[in-house]
UniProtKB/Swiss-Prot annotation:
It comes from the Bacteria. HAMAP family: UPF0102 (MF_00048). Gene3D superfamilies: 3.40.1350.10. InterPro entries: Restrct_endonuc-II-like (IPR011335), tRNA_endonuc-like_dom_sf (IPR011856), UPF0102_YraN-like (IPR003509). Belongs to the UPF0102 family. SUPFAM superfamilies: Restriction endonuclease-like. This is UPF0102 protein Lxx14785. Pfam families: UPF0102. One of its GO terms (molecular function) is nucleic acid binding.
Length: 118
């Protein structure tokens, strides 16, 4: 596995643990179809949350959340709709969030949660 992939997987694990620590219940990870992937699917209260995780080792190339372009947000919206078509929407609202993780390998990674990006 390439270092970039390892860093991304580590960031997703950090984000998943952070969500659980903040009361979210994980219901899926790395849901893939031909057109893309949803990193984390979770529930908080009556909201199903679809989470895109972006991880960077440093900010030399910008903050991780800067990687969420309008095109990526549109793709996430389409993936969320496809997930709902596949599994049926759960009761309550839907939301798409982003989590940026910096220094994922450190004992204290920086986590930035941005709810409702689409």
């Amino acid at each position: 596995m390439a270092k970039k992939d390892e860093l991304g997987r580590r960031g997703e694990s950090v984000a998943a643990h952070w969500l659980e620590a903040h009361g979210y219940v994980l219901i899926g990870r790395n849901w893939r179809i031909r057109s893309g992937e949803i990193d984390i699917i979770a529930r908080t209260g009556n909201i199903t949350v679809f989470v895109e995780v972006k991880t960077r080792a440093t900010t030399h190339y910008g903050h991780p959340l800067e990687a969420i372009t309008p095109e990526k947000a549109a793709r996430l919206r389409r993936l969320t709709a496809e997930w709902c078509r596949t599994y049926g929407p759960l009761p309550g609202a839907l939301r798409v969030d982003a989590i940026g993780v910096l220094n994922a390998w450190s004992a204290n990674p920086e986590i930035h949660h941005l709810p409702g990006i689409v």
